[in-house]
Design a protein with these regions (language model features):
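N-terminal loops that bind phosphate or other acidic moieties
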Residues: 1-131, 135-195
Length: 195
């Protein structure tokens, strides 16, 4: 019998690879003759780069940028041929802050722009930005501001997400996700007024 472990990460506690290894270790302890394989997976949040780094042509690059509170940091991204993959959680991730009403009011997507610019300079023609696991609710305003006049005419920019919520409203991004990022009910109402 063959067993495949492909478990997504548990936010803030264990990576996909760690969970796969734990599951397979338990299975092999009970059934040592089984054939097992581990394949890390991700849903668009934490771990996207770890999963794609297994690709033969994956090249890890780094970019100097700022996190969601404006603190300097260096983050990895991947080049797969002329496609770059950027994991938002590495730049503006919820795990980078202690969430509170104060952090949600200061948190910005600004730092993503520097990573996109770095990927363009590295030759990327397609840039995939995984959108999960963030600690921001600025609707991408900081990201757009940081790009400024960057020429994107020869670049395809793709947002990778496992949700389909609209920008704002009853089922909008702020209504559904801002509370987990520290927003109060009043802040969520204000975020929903950004149209």
């Amino acid at each position: 019998m063959k067993i495949l472990a492909a478990i997504d990460s548990f936010k803030g506690s264990a990576t996909s690879e760690q969970l796969n290894d734990a599951a397979l270790s338990g299975i092999l302890a009970a059934y040592p003759d089984l054939q097992v394989q581990s394949i890390p997976i991700a849903d668009g949040g934490e771990g996207v780069l770890d999963v794609l780094a297994y690709q033969e042509n994956a090249i890890t690059k780094t970019s100097l940028t700022t996190d969601l509170l404006g603190r300097k940091l260096e983050v990895p991204y991947l080049l797969l041929g002329d496609t770059a993959v950027i994991e938002s959680a590495k730049v503006i991730g919820i795990d980078l802050v202690d969430v509170s009403p104060e952090t949600i009011s200061r948190a910005t997507t600004y730092g993503l722009g520097a990573v996109v610019q770095s990927a363009i300079q590295a030759g990327a023609k397609t840039i995939i930005v995984s959108l999960g696991g963030t600690g921001t609710s600025d609707g991408g305003q900081g990201f757009l501001k940081s790009l400024g006049t960057t020429d994107l005419s020869d670049v395809t920019l793709i947002g990778a997400s496992d949700v389909t919520n609209p920008y704002y409203g009853e089922n909008g991004a702020a209504t559904i996700f801002a509370a987990q990022k520290g927003a109060t009910a009043d802040q969520i109402k204000q975020l929903n007024q950004r149209d």
